[in-house]
Amino acid sequence: MATRKARNPLAFMPWPVTILTTAMYLALIIPLLVIHHNVPPAPRTSPNGLNLTEAWQDLQSLTKGFHPYNSHQNDEVRSWLLERIDAIKQSTPSTEEYRDAKEEKPDVFVFDDLVSNLTFIDKSVGVYFEGTNILVYIRGSEDNKQNWWETPGRAPVGKGGVLVNAHYDSVSTGYGATDDGVGVVTCLQLVKYFLTPGHAPRRGLVVLFNNGEEDYLNGARVYSQHPMARFAHTFLNLEGAGAGGRATLFRSSDTEVTQAYAKSEHPFGSVLSANGFEKGLISSQTDYVVLEGILGLRGLDVAFFEPRARYHTDQDDARHTSIDSLWHMLSTAVATTEELVSDTTDRFDGHIRDDGTVPSGSGTRAVWFDLFGSAFAVFRLHTLFALSVTLLIVAPLTLLVTSVILSRADKMYLFRSSVYSEINDDYIPLRGLRGFFRFPFLISIPTGVTVGLAYMVTKVNPFIAHSSSYAVWSMMISAWIFLAWFVSRVANSARPSAFHRVYTWTWMFVLTWSLMVVCTVYEHEEGLAGGYFIFFYFAGTFLATWISYLELFALPTKSEYVGRLAESRRPSTQGSRLAASGDEHQDDAAEEDPTESTSLLHGRHRPTFANYVRVGVDRASQDEEEEEEDPNVYEHEQGWSGVLPRWTWLLQLLITAPVILMLIVPLALLTTSALSQTGQDGSPQLLIYLFISCLTALLFAPMLPFIHRYTYHLPIFLLFVFIGTMIYNLVAFPFADSNRLKLFFLQEVDLDNGISTASLTGMPPFVSDVTYGLPSAAGQNESCDWTFRGKRKLQRCSWSAPLPHVVPDGDSLSVSSEDADSLLDATELSPDWISFSISHPQRDSSSVRFEVSGQNTRNCRINMDGNSITNFSVIGSSAPDHRFLNPSPDGLNRIQLWSRTWDNKWTVDVDFSKHDSSETDEVDESSITGRITCLWSDNNRVGLIPALDEVRQFSPAWVAVTKFSDGLIEGSRAFEIKRSSLGALGS
């Protein structure tokens, strides 16, 4: 007769367990990988109100050249944008067509802002910026019909509107296709869409094309000075921190505004990324921090996030993105904006605030994440907190009550090694404690080894994740699964136990309960929702554990089992005693007739230790043989285990693995893409490898209750995978043409002595190898030191470089991009690149007046050798805005000056402190020293910056060059001010 386990194809047996668990993991991981790396296709026919072909052509026009704020190409992009906006406005359908759609034709206003300026202080840096933003306002059907902005100081009337923001400047080394060209053309299409009959907004829509985001978020800051900045209450910021792929929801301000994003056809993102920004794990910032943090709007930050290696390089172009990526951001923006402008409730309106922020009301902190890139879950953090607290209490109580019921039913075999038998007047072994101490080794050994691998890779080949992150994942996963299987098989061979599964689930329950406590505390104290997946992880683990406890009700009572076992042993025991008695009689008879060979000792006084051991072993062996008479018992497991259900393991797998994989795999992929290529920026590489090792344990821990049933085929295969990937990860070169290493370029020209020094900054030893492989640097003494770019410590290697051609000879002060070739004839260094003067506007004052001008630029600086500036003002600037004043108590050491016109002369009044807080006894306190620096960023002609051209031409194919600072060229002249010449300071 066939046994129960033989008849059941889903039984807890090696082949079903191996095949089904492997199939389930692959069936979920593979689609998630495909979704992560493949963008949903754009429709063949553009939806009503949109034109994808036109949008793609606009992107190509926008990205013809590098167009940073301080470039002539930027002016051309601005002119082109105004033309495109005007063309869209002129093509607006007639009033009759709107009537057919039962709508009123909306009013459209275009603001070409060449007036707004802003002076702000951020710690030790002061900035004066003149904006060149473009705003398009589409009046909503429920907006006030008056042009309230035409009256100075007048506040908007009625409900707040919606702002969509993108910046049209790029960095000086990137074409800006995704940073932020796609965002810009999306904004153009939004203007077109909401001017199409059937889509007229109910709330007013402001579309902002800001200029200057790449430098201190200047464009968004100066937008605050425009009257329309008081109108919008919600916003959608479109950005690019990668160079293609999907656009992810980086962060959001609250639940209510995030619900608008949930209307997107292909939502993508997790609240974990928002927590990364909040805790400073992601250092780069977007206009979101200005719009939400300073102006008080409530909104969303949507951006491209990979591949990071193309970000701010010449591969951020139309060639390396796609119309599918464009459609992903455009469709998201349309759905989100349409939901926001259609909202007529008061949830985005509040009372006027004293701090100058807009009265946008207050929202609730949110939890949000996508599911397979097609659905989006969003709910309040308070809801997650309430559910977490409830589950933390209910789950252990449920297991406790179940355990009590099992004990009263006399079926609590757990934690019992034996039970007393009145029949035999002895303890009968249950072996119910077997397998209890297995889990700590089962989890710690594989995880400890993968953590060790993380440290080893960081030591030997730290940047391999830059181009081969999946090789790292393969190494970690294969090592973890093989070791988990090996440890479980060794343990199960030595002490087979039917309780391996229930004990493993119990340990996992305790572990996830502890993690849940930590996450719940952070939810309440810090407002962090990134641990939402732990809630679902714990919930699944609890249910799986409870199922294992409920299985115990299928067991016979312990007394019944012991009684049956005792009865089965009674005859054999009596027979043994009779046999033993007969042996004794025979021995006695033999002793009565001693012979010459008889021992001198009497037989009954012989040592009996050997006999005792043999009898004990025979009894234990006999117990096991009697227990194993049940054909449903697996191998050498406990005899009572034959009645346990054989299919519940699959239910446990279905409850835990799918949910865990659906939530954690996207997080793993998202974070891997975001972090794997940040090491080139100076981020600690160990972080990504530790992240992968820990995520591996979380992803595959649901296998542990079943892994001792695996056949050897898959683990042995994974062992070979581990060996191969480990060797590859240790010896392979970490960079490739498609995953280049970014080096940061800067050329500094001392206009006082004509010294021109170029430098490349990046990670050692690659930066020095590249630098001194250049023709102009060959033969020069290596000059490398350490510097900081932001908070990241990097190596900088310098060499004497040919002069740039950024300023024309003769009397010409500026050139357009069409005439930029004339700069190539400028071969002589002229101190007239920068002109400045220093005077005292008031005799008895600590103020000094600087007049600064640079040729063919609109960006200069006043750099101090110490933090000696207490205040400054630019003549002709607007009144200071207290929202943007955040000075350091030590004072300022730099003033950044930006002008919307070329060759501008800034007049700056600077107040100095009596004593420089950074000065030491070795510094001459009788004078104030510094440098006037101007910057040049125009890089659209070969030959303008020979050193940069040389880097691009002669660097290896796996190297990309990007800007180190605001400008590619910094020309400077020194100045000195005698403190005795300052009236107040000299008195």
UniProtKB/Swiss-Prot annotation:
Residues 36-384, 457-466, 523-526, 671-686, 737-987 are vacuolar. It comes from the Eukaryota. Residues 1-14, 406-435, 488-501, 548-649, 708-715 are cytoplasmic. GO terms for molecular function: metal ion binding; metalloexopeptidase activity. One of its GO terms (cellular component) is vacuolar membrane. Its EC number is 3.4.-.-. This is Vacuolar membrane protease. PANTHER family: METALLOPEPTIDASE M28 FAMILY MEMBER, VACUOLAR MEMBRANE PROTEASE. Binds 2 Zn(2+) ions per subunit. GO terms for biological process: proteolysis. The record marks Y311 as: Transition state stabilizer. It is a multi-pass membrane protein. The chain crosses the membrane at residues 15-35, 385-405, 436-456, 467-487, 502-522, 527-547, 650-670, 687-707, 716-736. Zn(2+) 2 binds at D179, E214, H312. Keywords: Glycoprotein, Hydrolase, Membrane, Metal-binding, Metalloprotease, Protease, Transmembrane, Transmembrane helix, Vacuole, Zinc. Zn(2+) 1 binds at H167, D179, E239. May be involved in vacuolar sorting and osmoregulation. Residues 572-600 are annotated as: Disordered. Belongs to the peptidase M28 family. It is found in: Vacuole membrane. Its main location: membrane.
